[in-house]
Amino acid sequence: MFFTVVLYSDTINVSYELNPPKIVKGERFDLGQLKGNIQEMTNRASQLRGLVSGIHLTDSVLGVPRLSSVTAARYIKEHIDAEARLSCSIRVRDRNFPSLCQTVSDAILIGAESVLILMGDEPADKLGDSGLRPSSAVRMLKKEGYDLNIKLDLSFPAKVKDKSAQSIRNKLNVTPHSLVSQSISSLSDLGEIVDLAKPYGIKVTAVVMVPSEKNHQSASLIGLDWSEYESNPVDFIRQAAKMAHAVLLTSPNSFASGLQLLQQLKQ
């Protein structure tokens, strides 16, 4: 099973983000290569046992086609741990409402604890936008009763520049189970998100990117400044976990760095 990380007398809720493998590498689909990459993903999931409270599977980050988050979750359930606590991102940019319902139903059937409904990055070919938006999607899913069977979460900016912005109000008014931040750079920004969510009874998950050399490019791509915690990410994560309901650790370009930080957290 996957266990909550225990630090001294405190228990914190830390999950880890895994990217499912790309479906196509190069220009052609290669089933043998895909199966090998799935094995690598499940091996990584196995290494996380005892270090995290759960695993979050992403959905085609940067618009690059990958194995679906729900299919990836099924592989982990079947081959690593049937009791693993898993959550899945679901992009709405590529889905209409019937397609979304199918995917959320699949997530429920494989035993995922939650789904993170997000817009998703624009695909490289820049083709296709279903017109569905995350807040509207959650509202429709709740109307259909999906929230009685799985937690419905929404993505949220790491820093709120305008609390009265319609996009912010929409996310709060639909009252998802949790708001999952983009990668945070400061505890003060996280505190503002928690304060916004609290009156609505919404939980907050703080996403923290591992400050490693190999993740610099990813940080630059999203404008993340990790100077506040680069020298001491362990304490930063501990503090974030006290403020928020949970922390989701991401290390997009270095699994080894993420694993090392998780091991430090457990000491």
Residue ranges of model-derived segments:
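Conserved N-terminal beta1-alpha1 strand-loop-helix module at the mouth
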Residues: 2-57
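C-terminal extensions of enzymes
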Residues: 12, 237-266
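Hydrophobic faces of well-ordered beta-strands that scaffold small-molecule active sites
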Residues: 12-20, 53-57, 84-90, 115-117, ...
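Active-site mouth loops of central-metabolism enzymes
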Residues: 15-39, 86-98, 150-164, 218-231
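Glycine-rich, positively charged N-terminal anion/phosphate-binding segment
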Residues: 35-42, 63-80
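Active-site-adjacent beta->alpha loops and helix N-cap segments on the catalytic face
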Residues: 64-75, 95-102, 121-141, 184-201, ...
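Conserved anion-binding
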Residues: 114-182, 188, 194, 198-220
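Catalytic-face loop-and-helix region of soluble metabolic enzyme cores
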Residues: 201-245
